[in-house]
Amino acid sequence: MRIKQASKNIKYATIAYFLKIILQLVVRLVFVKSLPVEYLGINGLFTNLLAMLSLAELGVAPAIVYSLYQPLATQDSATVKSLMQLFKKAYISIGCIIITAGICMIPWLDWFIKENDITGIKWFYFIFLLNTGLSYFYSYKRNLLIADQKQYVNSIYQSVGQIVLSVLQILALLVFPSYWLYIILMLLV
């Protein structure tokens, strides 16, 4: 049964990975054709800054998955429930730390971005920050699927979300070439 689940997880993860790459490429092409190139640079900078802040997780996910294996194998639902409550608190704390650290970085954004003509750049960053930080408030649940060898369920949900987001972003860029709308969609989907 474990081999069957593992192969199913690999198959769905591979499909999801290639789908994500293709969708990101299409969205990036539409992005470059619809908005000034400066927005692409800002988008990349914010992505890198927030990836650095996401290091706050520091390997919590593998520890969660490892601690769930035994109670799931023995069907100890009380232990699973209590561990999930603990992980929920940990992930909410991590999300709050990321948001707080990100807010503390706002005064130094001008140091990273010189001579820009883009108005509202700090608001753009704040929306990116919320998108990253708030994702931790519910992402702890994924670890239960991984520990239960049902990663394919997560892959399906992520793929559907990626498709919806990509289609909405492409439509938004083509109809209303607005960076505001582009990043707000990231927060909503």
Where are the predicted features?
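N-terminal membrane topogenesis motif
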Residues: 1-24, 78-85, 121
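Transmembrane helical elements of multi-pass membrane transporters/channels
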Residues: 8-28, 40, 161, 185-189
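Hydrophobic transmembrane helix module of multi-pass membrane transport proteins
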Residues: 2, 47, 90-189
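Interfacial/gating helices of multi-pass transporter permease domains
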Residues: 31-55, 179-184
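Small-residue-rich midsections of specific transmembrane alpha-helices
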Residues: 23, 27, 44-72, 91-94, ...
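Helix-terminus/linker motif at the lipid-water interface of multi-pass membrane proteins
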Residues: 25-40, 110-114, 173-175
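Helix-terminus/helix-capping segments at the ends of transmembrane helices and short amphipathic helices
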Residues: 32, 68-73, 110, 146
